[in-house]
C-alpha cells in the first residue's frame, strides 16, 4: 500500500513537472537568425518622459483641462502624433522642432 502511494506521488510529480516545463518560456535562443521564426510581431517600446517625482506626481497635480493639452501631428512619408501639455510644449517645443527638421531634411548621398 505504501509503495503504491509513493508511486502515485512520483507519477503526479512527473506530470506536474512536465506541464511546468512545457509552459516555461524563457532564456536565450541558440538559433541562428535564419532559423528563428519570422513574423512574430513585437510590441514597440513604450517611450515616455520619466520624472524623478514618479507616480506621486500624477496624483498631486490638478486634472488637465482640454485647453491645456496640445496635439501635434506631422504627415510626411510617415505620421507622428504627439500629445502634450502647454507647459511641456513650451519646455520642449524647440528641441522637438530641431529633431523634426533633422529627420525630415534631405540627407546628402554618401560617396
UniProtKB/Swiss-Prot annotation:
Annotated segments matching region Disordered: 28-53
Cellular component, GO annotation: extracellular space
Residue stretches of biased makeup (Basic and acidic residues): 38-53
Biological process per Gene Ontology, one example term: regulation of response to food
Lipid anchor positions (O-octanoyl serine): 29
Location(s) in or outside the cell: Secreted
Signal peptide limits: 1-26
GO molecular function: G protein-coupled receptor binding; ghrelin receptor binding; growth hormone-releasing hormone activity
Keywords assigned by UniProt, alphabetized: Amidation, Cleavage on pair of basic residues, Hormone, Lipoprotein, Secreted, Signal
Predominant place of localization: secreted
Lipid-modified residues, O-hexanoyl serine kind: 29
UniProt superkingdom: Eukaryota
Lipid group attachment sites (O-decanoyl serine): 29
InterPro entries in UniProt: Motilin_assoc, Preproghrelin
Propeptide residue span(s): 51-111
Tissues of expression: Highest levels in stomach and anterior intestine. Lower levels in posterior intestine, kidney and brain. Low levels in heart, head kidney and middle intestine.
Residue positions where Valine amide is found in the record: 47
UniProt PTM comment: O-octanoylated by GOAT/MBOAT4. O-octanoylation or O-decanoylation is essential for activity. The O-decanoylated form ghrelin-21-C10 differs in the length of the carbon backbone of the carboxylic acid forming an ester bond with Ser-29. 44% of eel ghrelin is O-decanoylated.
Similarity section: Belongs to the motilin family.
Protein name: Ghrelin
Amino acid at each position: 500500500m505504501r509503495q503504491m502511494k509513493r508511486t502515485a506521488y512520483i507519477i503526479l510529480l512527473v506530470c506536474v513537472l512536465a506541464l511546468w516545463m512545457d509552459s516555461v518560456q524563457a532564456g536565450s535562443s541558440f538559433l541562428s537568425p535564419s532559423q528563428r521564426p519570422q513574423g512574430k510581431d513585437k510590441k514597440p517600446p513604450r517611450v515616455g518622459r520619466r520624472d524623478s517625482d514618479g507616480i506621486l506626481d500624477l496624483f498631486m497635480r490638478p486634472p488637465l483641462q482640454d485647453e491645456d493639452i496640445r496635439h501635434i501631428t506631422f504627415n510626411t512619408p510617415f505620421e507622428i502624433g504627439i500629445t502634450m501639455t502647454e507647459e511641456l510644449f513650451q519646455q520642449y517645443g524647440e528641441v522637438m522642432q530641431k529633431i523634426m527638421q533633422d529627420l525630415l531634411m534631405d540627407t546628402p548621398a554618401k560617396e
